[in-house]
Amino acid sequence: LAPNLEIGLRINPEISFLDDSRYDPCRAYSKLGAPISSVKETLVNGSPILSGLLFHNNCNSPDFQELLLTVKKLESELGCVLDNSRWINLGGGYLFDGDSVNLDSFDEAVWTLKSKHGLEVYIEPGSTFVRDAGFLVSTVLDLIENGGKAIAILDTSVNHLPESFEYDWRPDMLTDIKQGRYSYII
């Protein structure tokens, strides 16, 4: 390996907080991280090339108690791995906004990882910071009718804003008039 190269492993902490499995990175048969139960023995016995761990086990959660519970599980299952790592990435999935609760649990989780295990702690920005960070600008190319519904054909597709399809999320439209005379499917 190159001298400055660091290798991390994405783990699945196998602790779920979501009711909707579509958004649950820790659901059964998830491809989003190696399950702790599958890699625990290998990791506990040592991995000289592993620099850190990454997990992501939530989606749009305002409750940081869930993060603390995850960190406590990691400590109980992989405490010695944490002690021998340089960093940990707490992933995303938590909302840092006016609806957040148990922020003291966030502080405790980070403090535990830094002070007890000596880890550099990263957290991904999440939708709180990036959801409204930009705009998708589109032009109506054509209007058609199908089955009595007006449809606007745009110069963009769902591929440019996949969460509108994946998560059944309706983005705000700059010129949208809620009670306007016209209604279109886009």
Residue ranges of predicted features:
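Solvent-exposed alpha-helices and their adjacent loops that cap or buttress functional pockets
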Residues: 2, 24, 46-47, 89, ...
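Active-site-proximal beta-alpha core segment in soluble small-molecule metabolic enzymes
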Residues: 1-87, 99, 109, 118, ...
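Charged (often Lys/Glu-rich) extended helix/loop segments that serve as interaction or gating elements
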Residues: 109, 120-186
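A broad, structure-centric signal for solvent-exposed, well-ordered loop/edge residues
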Residues: 39-41, 62, 97, 130, ...
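Active-site-proximal loop/turn and secondary-structure-junction residues that shape catalytic pockets
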Residues: 11-15, 57-59, 94-96, 127-129, ...
